[in-house]
Structures are given as C-alpha cells and as structure tokens.
Amino acid sequence: MFLGPLMLDIAGTTLTETDRVQLSHPLVGGVILFARNYESPAQLSELTASIHALRSPPLLIAVDQEGGRVQRFRDGFTRLPPMRTLGEIQDRNPDLSLHLARQIGYVLAAELKACGVDVSFTPVLDLDCEQSSVIGDRAFYREPQVVAELAHALMSGLQSVGMVAVGKHFPGHGAIQADTHVETAIDSRNYTDIEKKDLTPFRRMIDTGLSGIMAAHVIYPAIDPNPAGFSSKWLQDILRNELGFRGCIFSDDLCMQAARNYGSITHRAEQALQAGCNMVLICNDPDSADELLTSLQWEFSAVDTARLEHMRGQQTVHSMAQLHEMERFIRATEEISRISLANISVSV
C-alpha cells in the first residue's frame, strides 16, 4: 500500500474504531495532530505508535509546533518562543539569533521525534510586515534576507535529529490583514513586488534543501484568480519550474473559510491536487473527510509517493527520558529558557 494524498485529523487522545477505519483507507497518507490529541509525552507516544502500526508504510504524522501561540504540545514539552523573538534578538546580536534558531530547531525536532511525530509544519517564511494578525509574531522578521537566514538555521537544527522542514505559507501571507481561517484573503500586489520580497526566503530555503512547502489560501489576482494552493501558475510554473522546488507540496486546510468558496470538498481536493499539491489537509470537519473518502478519485504517482516518504525524515533512537539526560539537549533547553528581549544572557 502507498501513502495516499489526504491528511486527516482525529478527535481525541486515542484512536477510535472509526479513526482506524478512516485512516486505513488507501486515499489517506497522513494524520495531523492538534492540542486536543495531547495529554502527555507518554500518551502521545502511545497514540503515534498506534497510528504508525495501522499501515505499511506507516502514515505520516504531522503537527503545527512552531513556538509561541502555535505550539500544540505544551505540558511536558519545552516552551518555545514566537519566532519574532529571534528577529528582535537579531537586531542586537545576529550570531546569537542564528545560534538560538538552531537550538530551537534541534529541541523542537528532538522532542517530537522522541514521541513518534514525523514532521512539524515549520518554519513560517512569511515576512513580518505588521499587517497580518494571523501571522504576526509567528514570522521571524520584516527583511526577507534575515528571514531566510534564521529559517535556514532553524532547519539545520531540525535536520540534526532527522526531521525535515516545511516552509509556509507560499508565496507569502505576511502582507495582508485577512485571516484565511475565517475570510477570503486577497493580496493585490504585482508579481515583481512579491518576487523581490516574499519569494526570497522560499528561494533561499529551496536552494539549501527545503523538503516541504505549504501553500497559502491567498488570492493574488495580478498573477492568478485562484488562491495559490489551487493555482498551477503558482505551484507548477513558479514553484516547480521557476524556483526549482522538487520536494513535497502541502495544501493548507481545505476546510478553512478561504477555501470553502471553491465548491464541494471533493472539488477543492481535486483542484488542489491538479494544481500541484502532493497532499491536502482536511481538518476539523469529519463529514467532509467522510465525503472525500467516498467520492475522490485520484491516481497517485511514484513521484508523489517518493516525495511523501521523504517527509518522514530519519527515525530517532532517543526517548523523551533519554533526551533529558543528554548534555546537548540540557544546554539547548537552558538557553531557550533564558531568551529575553531585555536581558539576553546566552553565550555562543
């Protein structure tokens, strides 16, 4: 059995029989976890083991574990700062900010891998334009070159323990106020402006080995009337052909309000996959997931399968308890805990 193109969610902290049936469907290739699925590292490890045991090859398990307000697993995990904190440290001490970005990437990945989670949808590559409340302090910085440097450092930390990175939200969500979770989002800039600014972090990260990209549900009417995640112009012509990206393309959640204007859930999934997504997310809408599993017809290619398999990264051999005895991990978590805008006491 291959990994299918759908990533679904589950309701609770353990698998129900309904979950097992859904996740065993050949169209499914992954599971995204939320805060409601988490109680403790031990419980999470049991949950991920049960998900991985359902299929061969195992389903891909993902989470949004960025830091700051977007950190699904908190108690028992290291509290990670919002990425804007690294940008503010960069203004004072660029070398320190890069060091801390690597440390955050390492700790983030080490803890998730220890609990059986394959990938986090991070880093955010959107610019901090002080326009978007939904992005806000999730972004590293206002200048694209600095975003690229900090994101690359964080990716290096992830990769040091076998986790790949997923940059988001292509081609850039930082310059608009609208929140795609609840409304349509339109960016009226021309391609030249977007290419010079927003695409720079994506281009730099692609050139240095970025494995995954998540597309935005944002409309850029000067380029294409469809949102980027439904646009072959963005995903094929620009991302694949112009920027040379060869990794895995994820949609954002197809049940977000900005995506619901594009027909039934089946039509949305078909449009996103035809545009160039390798995997589409269906979250917080069990009825839509059921409908899609019944109605979607999709032939998955060997290239798609290879791209999804690569997102698994390398498996860790360390448990959470073992991590807490490792000198590298102890030092990294101590440094992260001392991050303060007023008093940076970490030495590189």
UniProtKB/Swiss-Prot annotation:
Its main location: cytoplasm. Its EC number is 3.2.1.52. One of its GO terms (molecular function) is beta-N-acetylhexosaminidase activity. GO terms for biological process: carbohydrate metabolic process; cell division; cell wall organization; peptidoglycan biosynthetic process; peptidoglycan turnover; regulation of cell shape. Substrate binds at residues 64, 72, 138, 168-169. The active site is at 181 (proton donor/acceptor), 252 (nucleophile). It catalyses: Hydrolysis of terminal non-reducing N-acetyl-D-hexosamine residues in N-acetyl-beta-D-hexosaminides. Pathway: Cell wall biogenesis; peptidoglycan recycling. InterPro entries: Beta_hexosaminidase_bac, Glyco_hydro_3_N, Glyco_hydro_3_N_sf, Glycoside_hydrolase_SF, NagZ_Beta-hexosaminidase. The record marks 179 as: Important for catalytic activity. NCBIfam families: PRK05337.1. This is Beta-hexosaminidase. It comes from Nitrosomonas eutropha (strain DSM 101675 / C91 / Nm57). The gene is nagZ.
